[in-house]
Amino acid sequence: MRDTTRRLESGRPTWRFPRAFWTGNAVELFERAAYYGTFIALAVFLTDVVGFSDVAAGWIGALFSSSIYLLPFVTGALSDRLGFRPSLLLAFTLLALGYGGLAFFPTQGAVPFSLALVAMGGAFVKPVITGTVARSSDGASRARAFSLFYMMVNIGSFTGKTVARPVRALMGVGSVPLYSAFAALAALAITALFFFPRENGEERPRSVAQSLEGLAVVLRNGRFLALILITAGFWAIQGQLYASMPKYVLRLVGPEASPEWYANVNPLVVVLLVVPVTHLVRKLSPVASIGVALGLIPLSALVMSLSGNLQGPVRLFGATLHPVTVLMVSGIALQGLAECFLSPRYLEFASRQAPPGQEGLYMGYAHLNTFFAWLFGFALSGYLLEAFCPDPKVLAARGLSREAMAAAYAHAHYLWYAFAGVGLLAFLGLLAFALLPGRRENR
């Protein structure tokens, strides 16, 4: 521990970090496995198990997923005052209760309450873990620390969705949240036994009111807010892995499809490439690296849309695949590559803006781009699904013939055109951002 501290204080880049860093990353893996296991199934769960329409499910998913990125404005300040360890214990208790509620009480009245518990628990986890990463690294090693953190996030994401597929196939989509509840309990046990971070006792944390006042000052920084909104375009498309893709695939390919595993291509690509890409772009400014990501993300949506132009199965490496499968996987892989250029540099930039003792609050603000993206992307998804890729149960209830039902899906791929347009607008916005004077983000 002392050797690690000396290395950090030396100002030289290092891959060695204190125990709290590694323990925090371990529980982050379990939390992400729990979250993404349920998140990949949520859109289908809300319609097929709970009975909501596509539009209602889209709005519920939008409010749930976006609130996880809004609540840290409050929970970040609370975690700084309560301490990171008590905050994390509270977080995993809320998560276990929330996921358990989804599994045992899947009704339209109870599900929103259970999702609120999950959102509150997740909102505590985010600022605590990212704050721990920031406190456990110095300026010379911070990019490495966040690249390792982001790798663990994606390993957890990969694991959660990998397990969700057999759970859905063998026990039904309604049982997926039960798996997430067990993962949250495992994270709670690890936190209780092993997570003892060094608190910044010499710094007096702000109150919630003071933190919100500080947030108002930050929000008046037009350039940083513009960067938040521009990068939200990236995450609005990325969010369709959970909002649109599962229903799109299951409705066009059939129940034997594996949207959970298709979505896993994204974290697999990130795990394999995030460290080398971080090394590759280390001399680029944050805006230049983000620009590469925003150039790739609309292309990924266009690749997904090409399924509407292919007829019949595709033979690839000796296997016969549905064209939707081939193009979904290709587009998702491209999204993973784009994410490697965006996320580590973006988090690095945001963490460098944090004042002493306030990493939790400021890192919560850094994720505000995902708040806007999830709120917009999930809500839009519900309307696009209803228009171009409707629920087959709704069509059957209308008494449509087989031919009429097939015609209802003829333009399903138009959904991806809409999100390609969102990505293009984000890219053009970044170009304008880079050309305007006063580029503080390059510092």
Where are these regions (language model features)?
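Helix-to-loop junctions at the C-terminal end of transmembrane segments
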Residues: L71-F84, R168, L272-V292
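Symmetry-related core transmembrane helices of the 12-TM Major Facilitator Superfamily/SLC fold
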Residues: G174-L193, Y409-A432
